[in-house]
Amino acid sequence: MPERGAVAYIGGGMPAEKAVLTAELRLDVQEFYARYAECLDGGRLQQWPEFFLEACVYRITTRRNLRLGPDQDLVSLSSRTAMFDRIVAIGQSEDYEPHMQRHTVSGFRIQAASGQELRAQANFQILRTFPEQRSEHFVSGSYNDRIAVAAGRLHFREKICVLDSDVAPTSLVYPI
């Protein structure tokens, strides 16, 4: 039986005693996702890598390519340094039209908890708006994440963005 103030989240055959998370931690993780989306929506790309551990994995793939393995990823970065390099490249690129993104994150759930790591999943939808044009649906999919919990701070250890469509977007510049 969970302690008063704790909520049990059980998934994937995980034993109940390992699935007990405090409501406060769950709210912290939801806030972490909200701040992640806010950072990207606000165009603060220089801050994006700060959501990750130094040794991390960031991938964007399709549902089909996820089954085929990392070699088929649309984007694959293996460190925070690689993320900063990508941000610099975006700033220097002249091959894309600047635009805004607006993330909607929903269906958030913690799938597993062990030690100082959580496995979480959430759905996302991103709208894209070019200057003087209407907003359009850009991509949708799910985040499949491993989140490190240490010293009261959360960081992504692994973030896999799985696009619903097997057809890759024509322009995948900004982080998802």
Predicted ranges, named:
Residues 54-123:
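A solvent-exposed, acidic/Ser-Thr-rich amphipathic alpha-helical stretch
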Residues 2-42, 46, 50-54, 61:
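Short, low-complexity N-terminal intrinsically disordered segments enriched in polar/charged residues
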Residues 9-12, 102-104, 109-176:
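A beta-strand edge to alpha-helix "cap/lid" segment located at domain peripheries
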Residues 36, 48, 83, 120, ...:
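Hydrophobic pocket/interface hotspot
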Residues 27-31, 74, 81, 138:
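A generic "alpha-helical surface" signal
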Residues 21-24, 71, 135:
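Conserved aromatic-histidine-acidic binding/catalytic patches
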Residues 36-38, 91-98, 131-134:
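Short helix-to-loop capping/linker segments positioned immediately adjacent to catalytic or ligand/cofactor-binding
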